[in-house]
């Protein structure tokens, strides 16, 4: 799952930073992916086991793929919002302090914000489709579309946050505030991807981590 998301992030990043002047963004995207792959091979590693009966459905690859793609695009959007906030703090030509050498090669705040917004535009419908497909699968498997399972709940909260980000981003003078909402959405996404699986018991706790 994590490896698939890493691959999707790599593809999205490659499309976004293919221009020569965007290559300085690569380290900001590669570093978290290296950490994710390390955790995948250590903390989250487990022996392969037969798929539980509830997951033996053609809905599995459809639901997981759509949610994973939406989450991956959203995470890249969040990284660009982080870089945007750094650029707002240290505009082009006014870099200062110990972070100046790191921020100086980055594109302008306007360009970074534009990419974060465009990626979130894709995140919202893809993630929404994944949630809807999961609800359809839940009705077929357990006889109800929604059960407020922890993962379902936080997926819905994440989707609402991305909708709030897009709404705030469309409001004049709210670019910085919108970027912070995008970071909250990214944090909620990461919390849902890792903490929920590791600690909280629920219908999505099939990985054996909790």
Task: Name each model-derived stretch.
Residues 1-210:
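Polytopic transmembrane helical bundles with strong interfacial aromatic enrichment
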């Amino acid at each position: 799952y994590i490896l698939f998301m890493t691959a999707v992030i790599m593809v999205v990043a490659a499309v976004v930073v293919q221009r020569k002047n965007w290559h300085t963004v690569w380290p900001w995207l590669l570093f978290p992916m290296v950490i994710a792959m390390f955790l995948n091979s250590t903390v989250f590693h487990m022996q392969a086991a037969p798929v539980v009966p509830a997951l033996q459905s053609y809905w599995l690859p459809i639901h997981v793929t759509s949610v994973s793609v939406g989450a991956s695009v959203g995470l890249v959007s969040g990284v660009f919002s982080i870089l945007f906030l750094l650029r707002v703090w240290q505009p082009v030509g006014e870099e200062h302090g110990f972070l100046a050498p790191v921020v100086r090669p980055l594109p302008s705040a306007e360009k970074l914000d534009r990419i974060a917004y465009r990626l979130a535009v894709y995140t919202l419908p893809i993630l929404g489709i994944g949630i809807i497909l999961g609800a359809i699968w839940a009705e077929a498997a357990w006889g109800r579309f929604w059960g407020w399972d922890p993962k379902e709940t936080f997926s819905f909260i994440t989707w609402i946050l991305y909708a709030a980000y897009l709404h705030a981003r469309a409001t004049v003078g709210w670019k910085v505030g919108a970027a912070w909402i995008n970071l909250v959405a990214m944090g909620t996404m990461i919390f849902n991807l890792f903490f929920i699986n590791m600690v909280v018991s629920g219908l999505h706790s099939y990985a054996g981590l909790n």
